[in-house]
């Protein structure tokens, strides 16, 4: 005699389906919560209104010259350097490569180690440099590489352009140190530079600040702090291809991915990652919200800034960071300008004197700084 079929298998199947449903709901809730935090707490305001074309455009021809072709070819060595290198050693390899890139060049300047109130640095002095005419230079390198040594082709030129002393600050880098320490080091160096020159304690007659890429970000952040702290403002400042928005919202980050031969290969994989995940990664990495003006100067109060010049390439990934910053600063009433070049790589000014466009850009910088400086005594 056949008995009634047991209900246990059906109950077990129903239980399994319920468990799966609960798991799916839990995952959706967690992912939705993470997404909501990124969008409403980490991303900040939509700044697409500041995507208007702005600035002076420079070009030495309709097509790239042979010199920029040679520079781009040399950048291809980076990929070869990293081939087969474990992730944990990549920073060390890139740091060594960047520091040694321009070794052996005859710069014609004097290099003097400096202790900027506890922060190491390097004075760069062209012949006849006025020690009371001072520039604080903040190097780039994605906050993880670079040094005064790596940027001597720029700091030596700034000393000649201004006729003064350049202090290249050796701020602390990630990941060995928190992101905030680099900001603090630049602030200390600026305070110190106001009252100390290469020949000892003495007030500065003229003060400039300049930086490139990550150093441009630190430069713009420093300007906000100097204003809010009531310190003597620099007479003028320069930012070369700066990162201005740590929320990574600028359209050119994706639009110029394939036209940027320097940043594209290094950061291209990030373009495939959803922005909300990048926001979380940035927050966890720096312990600072990506939309915090401390690391996103684009999102700060941009009124009452000193005369400021930004230079950027129209084909680099960070171009819109500059364009948005200048549009927003001008709307706030600050004397901020953008100069744009076609066909150039990120921070092409460092490739001087071989690049004609680098020489042209540096000439513009010299004219800008000297026009803003107080008369020489």
Language-model features: locations:
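Alpha/beta-hydrolase superfamily serine-hydrolase fold, recognizing
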Residues: 25, 29-45, 110-377
């Amino acid at each position: 005699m056949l008995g009634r079929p047991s209900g246990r298998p059906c109950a077990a199947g129903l239980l399994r389906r319920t468990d799966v449903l609960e798991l799916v709901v839990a995952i959706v809730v967690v992912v939705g919560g993470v997404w909501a935090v990124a969008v409403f707490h980490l991303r900040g305001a939509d700044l697409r209104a500041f995507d208007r074309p702005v600035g002076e455009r420079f070009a030495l021809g309709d097509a790239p010259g042979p010199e920029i072709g040679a520079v781009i070819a040399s950048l291809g060595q980076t990929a070869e350097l990293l081939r087969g290198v474990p992730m944990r050693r990549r920073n060390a390899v890139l740091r060594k490569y960047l520091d040694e890139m321009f070794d052996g060049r005859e710069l014609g300047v004097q290099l003097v180690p400096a202790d900027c109130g506890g922060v190491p640095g390097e004075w760069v002095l062209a012949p006849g440099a006025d020690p009371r005419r001072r520039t604080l230079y903040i190097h780039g390198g994605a906050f993880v590489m670079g040094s005064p040594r790596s940027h001597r082709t720029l700091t030596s030129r700034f000393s000649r352009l201004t006729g003064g002393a350049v202090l290249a600050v050796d701020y602390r880098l990630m990941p060995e140190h928190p992101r905030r320490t680099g900001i603090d080091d630049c602030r200390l160096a600026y305070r110190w530079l106001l009252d100390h020159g290469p020949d000892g304690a003495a007030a500065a007659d003229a003060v400039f600040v300049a930086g490139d890429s990550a150093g441009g970000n630190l430069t713009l952040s420093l300007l906000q702090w100097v204003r809010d702290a009531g310190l003597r403002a620099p007479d003028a400042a320069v930012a070369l291809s700066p990162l201005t928005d740590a929320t990574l919202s600028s359209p050119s980050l994706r639009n110029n991915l394939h036209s940027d031969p320097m940043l594209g290969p290094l950061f291209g994989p990030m373009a495939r990652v959803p922005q909300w995940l990048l926001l979380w990664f940035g927050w966890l990495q720096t312990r600072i919200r990506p939309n915090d003006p401390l690391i996103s100067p684009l999102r700060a109060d941009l009124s009452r800034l000193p005369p400021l010049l930004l230079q950027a390439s129209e084909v680099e990934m960070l171009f819109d960071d500059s364009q948005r910053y200048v549009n927003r600063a001008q709307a706030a009433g600050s004397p901020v300008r953008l100069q744009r070049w076609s066909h150039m790589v990120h921070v092409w000014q460092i490739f001087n004197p071989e690049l004609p466009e680098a020489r042209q850009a540096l000439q513009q910088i010299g004219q800008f700084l000297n026009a803003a400086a107080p008369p020489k005594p």
